[in-house]
């Protein structure tokens, strides 16, 4: 069906230090990230075979991660980069980031992007009340639909998979080395 790359971060830190983490090429970590690194799994790239696109294959990948976590309860945190295609219109990227910054902000400054995405512009933030997640999500979907696009699958999955407060977007940045 597909695969998700992940690595136990404490083990990787013991072997290769902080430079052994892919996310460290994208983010500088603060002290508040230490407990996450000690009990975390860094999620990397994933793929789904084309024959399974459009099915519940991503759910199966999540079930596999869940089964791993059930057998290894020492891991409490999943973290990693999630991309937004550069093929999306700039306005769509700005709206997505404004929405996710508003509703899923970092509770503590645990990581800072090495290549920060510009702060959300007031005209993008004004699209959302910040008071009603479901109404603002509906608004985001409509705005993106007008631009001919939709919320990227992993953004939807991450925010819907976890219980309230269970997902945070620590920072937003660009990865000059990442190709669409």
Spans of features found by a protein language model:
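Extended effector regions of multi-domain proteins
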Residues: 176-179
